[in-house]
């Protein structure tokens, strides 16, 4: 006689996470969370509705995702985020790993076509929980600092320096110079240590005068302290000019909690939404709120 565990597609022995953290994005966590995710008919309908709007040509590019405490909105949003980003996990793309979850659904073919339509565009996806991250410089810098992380940079002034080098098409030269100056050590290993600042400066001084470096460092520090939605929009525009085939997507979790903690305010949200909406559908924001029932709607 078959046992229940023999007919289920999930492993009953696996631990179930009480909380899904959008800030946790290592490969093992993503695989574990995807393996445990169950796409019900209701969630499949929400996913289809979202993708229908997201893949359209509409200019509005903001989405609310709301639900009661424990409804799984963070879990759902994280799965959508990684479907869009489509990272390779243990040798297999996220979208390919997700497809078996469609088996048995009423709208399987429609949903599969919608997911495959994501292949037409290259997305840069940023996910973060705004109630758990440093809010010293406001919501806009929260978004920018995590955008830097999504690019593989640091989230501080060094990351902004890396970003500027990328915009000037000097980042590859910088990486090669660091390796040459540090006995073959990679910058991504060096920057984890206290010696990162000196290694950064030494490499940059090979193609920039010292006074120019110091002035750039000063300007970046001031920029971060006064970072706002307009600066975020300008930085994202520069990135999109460099990569015209890309679209940017922000998933911002626990907005209600961050508001209640006074880490952000409604003016922050309004400013961010207005600034990014001026970029059309090249920059999307998906904001997660606490409410009594789950719904997805256009902002």
Where are these regions (language model features)?
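P-loop NTPase motor core
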Residues: 34-37, 63-68, 75-195
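Substrate-engagement module of ASCE P-loop NTPases
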Residues: 232-242, 268-284
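Sensor-1/coupling segment of RecA-like P-loop NTPase cores
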Residues: 257, 275-298
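Walker A/P-loop-proximal flanking segment of P-loop NTPase domains
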Residues: 1-71, 77-78, 82-84, 96, ...
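Conserved P-loop NTPase "ATPase switch" module shared by AAA+ and STAND
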Residues: 240-263
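Long, low-complexity, polar/charged, intrinsically disordered or flexibly structured peripheral segments
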Residues: 183-232
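Conserved alpha-helical scaffold flanking the Walker A/P-loop in AAA+ ATPase domains
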Residues: 108-118, 230-244
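Flexible beta-alpha connector loops of hexameric P-loop NTPases
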Residues: 131-135, 220-226, 256-265
């Amino acid at each position: 006689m078959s046992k229940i565990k023999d007919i289920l597609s999930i492993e009953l022995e696996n631990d179930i996470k009480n909380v899904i953290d959008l800030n946790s994005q290592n490969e093992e966590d993503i695989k574990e969370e995807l393996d445990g995710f169950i796409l019900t008919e209701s969630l499949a309908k929400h996913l289809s509705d979202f993708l229908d709007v997201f893949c359209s040509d509409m200019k509005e590019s903001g989405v609310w995702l709301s639900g009661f405490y424990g409804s799984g909105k963070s879990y759902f949003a994280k799965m959508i985020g990684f479907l869009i980003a489509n990272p390779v996990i243990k040798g297999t793309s996220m979208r390919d790993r997700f497809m078996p979850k469609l088996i048995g659904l009423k709208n399987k073919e429609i949903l599969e076509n919608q997911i495959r339509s994501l292949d037409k565009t290259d997305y840069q996806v940023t996910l973060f929980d705004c109630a758990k991250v440093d809010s010293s410089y406001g919501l806009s810098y929260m978004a920018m600092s995590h955008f830097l992380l999504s690019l593989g940079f640091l989230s501080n002034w060094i990351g902004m320096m890396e970003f500027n080098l990328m915009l000037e098409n000097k980042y590859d030269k910088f990486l090669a110079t660091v390796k040459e100056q540090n006995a073959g050590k990679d910058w991504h290993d060096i920057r984890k240590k206290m010696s990162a600042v000196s290694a950064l400066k030494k490499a940059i001084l090979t193609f920039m005068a010292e006074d120019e470096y110091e002035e750039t460092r000063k300007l970046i520090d001031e920029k971060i302290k006064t970072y706002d939605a307009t600066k975020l929009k300008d930085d994202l525009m520069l990135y999109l000019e460099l990569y015209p085939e890309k679209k940017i997507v922000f998933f911002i979790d626990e907005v209600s909690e961050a508001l209640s903690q006074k880490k952000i305010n409604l003016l922050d949200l309004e400013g961010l939404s207005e600034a990014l909406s001026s970029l059309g559908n090249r920059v999307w924001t998906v904001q997660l709120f606490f409410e009594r029932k789950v719904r997805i709607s256009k902002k």
